[in-house]
């Protein structure tokens, strides 16, 4: 089991690393060449810039039982299809029950933006957002780590 991070624009990389070290979980961060990222604990995979290159690379490194941390609903859907776990950087899990609705909302939002050329402003991330993610990831690992690590025996 490992944690894979869609690292381009991910605001919780430091939190992920802190928790992964505590739980002795390998971390793989995938980023494109436009972002600088260095860490002695995590494996950093750097890919060319291009549409979905980092996303496809991340999914190609994902295995059953892994945890993928991403804000991209499409990446989350592909992770779930590989029987991996998917977590949003705001501290909630993507599931088979919510992914279809999330993808539909994303599609509808894209259509509206394309039609009206109107874009919403994303609110600035707060310290509380980071705390919520940290609490969620710890709780998620505490609740699921035995199940997740149990999948390793099946591989």
From Swiss-Prot:
Pfam families from the UniProt entry: DUF188
PANTHER family: UPF0178 PROTEIN YAII
NCBIfam families tied to this protein: PRK00124.1 (NF001095)
Family membership noted in the UniProt record: Belongs to the UPF0178 family.
Protein name: UPF0178 protein Clos_2709
């Amino acid at each position: 089991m490992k944690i894979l991070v869609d690292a381009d624009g991910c605001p919780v990389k430091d939190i992920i690393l802190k928790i992964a070290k505590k739980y002795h979980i390998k971390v793989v961060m995938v980023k494109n060449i436009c972002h600088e990222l260095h860490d002695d604990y995590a494996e950093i995979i750097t890919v060319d810039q291009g549409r979905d290159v980092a996303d496809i690379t991340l999914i190609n490194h994902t295995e059953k039982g892994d945890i993928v941390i991403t804000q991209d609903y499409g990446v989350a859907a592909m992770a779930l299809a590989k029987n991996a776990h998917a977590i949003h950087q705001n501290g909630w899990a993507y599931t088979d029950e919510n992914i279809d609705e999330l993808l539909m909302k994303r599609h509808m939002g894209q259509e509206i933006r394309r039609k009206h050329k109107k874009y919403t402003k994303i609110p600035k991330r707060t310290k509380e957002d980071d705390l919520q993610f940290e609490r969620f990831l710890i709780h998620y690992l505490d609740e699921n780590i035995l199940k997740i690590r149990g999948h390793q025996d099946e591989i």
